[in-house]
């Protein structure tokens, strides 16, 4: 970015953290160590398909992990601030227009429900930040309707004036970003496949639409969850017995054109 470029520039910067191992700069760890609360899900056992990933968990261990994770998040913010500053300086120096796009691939339980890392379909793992700023982007707006990582490619292509990619499952978020339009009825999905310890392969799928979120596992249908994340952010209450029709509709949408049994058989 310190050099002039005649062609449009796409600069991709990847960072490892925040991620395990949970090692943060000492001053940031100390900053959050005394401020960190234990999650209300600490003593709630994860579902059976997650049990193989459980580790020894104590309140002090979880507090330390979460303090380190929050410290890593702040350190990430500081690093991103430097990248954003360099990008803005480059645009200003050369009179160019540009967009800054930040996203992540997954979250982290950090002791929530007794385990660490990703590989679940709870909000701790699947909900991530997606932040876009720059020319033409509505500043200070927060979208309430679900979006997906699959939206990144079509959005960037439209921003760049490039040809639309074929066979896209995502959508361009330009109307949302430029005019604050909401897609209140939109459904987004995530999928999960794992070889739990001694339990065989399992395949799970999550769908979020409107106020509801459904989590289903092919090998453990008895553990299906219907959750209302807006009113139940820690996902403590399974509402499937109260709203079976909502669960049926979401399940049909989540597994439409998905050969789940074949995925499990072929691993």
Where are these regions (language model features)?
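Hydrophobic residues within well-ordered, non-membrane alpha-helices that form the packing/core
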Residues: 1, 84-87, 177, 254, ...
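Active-site-proximal cap/lid insertion segments
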Residues: 1-146, 159-167, 218-220, 245-248
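Short, amphipathic alpha-helical "lid/cap" segments that border enzyme active or binding sites
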Residues: 77, 150-153, 251
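C-terminal cap/loop subdomain of S1 sulfatases and analogous C-terminal strand-loop tails that border
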Residues: 106-112, 151-153, 158-229, 246, ...
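Active-site-proximal N-terminal segment of extracellular/periplasmic enzymes that hydrolyze or transfer
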Residues: 237-244
């Amino acid at each position: 970015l310190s050099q002039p470029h005649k062609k449009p520039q796409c600069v991709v910067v990847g960072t490892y953290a925040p991620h395990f191992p949970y090692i943060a700069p000492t001053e940031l760890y100390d900053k959050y160590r005394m401020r960190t609360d234990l999650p209300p899900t600490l003593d709630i056992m994860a579902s059976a398909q997650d049990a193989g990933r459980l580790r020894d968990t104590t309140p002090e261990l979880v507090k330390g992990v979460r303090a380190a994770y929050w410290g890593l998040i702040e350190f990430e913010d500081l690093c991103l601030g430097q990248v954003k500053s360099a990008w803005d300086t480059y645009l200003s120096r050369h009179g160019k227009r540009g967009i800054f796009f930040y996203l992540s691939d997954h979250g982290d339980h950090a002791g929530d429900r007794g385990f660490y890392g990703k590989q679940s379909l709870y909000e701790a793992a699947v909900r991530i930040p997606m932040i876009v700023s720059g020319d033409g982007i509505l500043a200070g707006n927060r979208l309430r309707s679900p979006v997906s990582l699959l939206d990144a490619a079509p959005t960037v292509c439209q921003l760049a004036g490039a040809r639309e990619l074929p066979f896209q499952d995502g959508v361009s978020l330009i109307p949302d970003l430029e005019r604050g339009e909401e897609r209140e009825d939109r459904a987004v999905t995530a999928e999960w496949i794992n070889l739990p310890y001694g339990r065989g392969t399992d395949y799970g799928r999550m769908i979020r639409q409107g106020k509801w979120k459904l989590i289903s596992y092919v090998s453990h249908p008895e553990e299906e969850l219907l959750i209302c994340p807006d009113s139940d952010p820690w996902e403590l209450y399974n509402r499937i017995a109260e709203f079976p029709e909502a669960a049926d509709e979401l399940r049909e949408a989540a597994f439409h054109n998905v050969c789940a049994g074949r995925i499990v058989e072929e691993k």
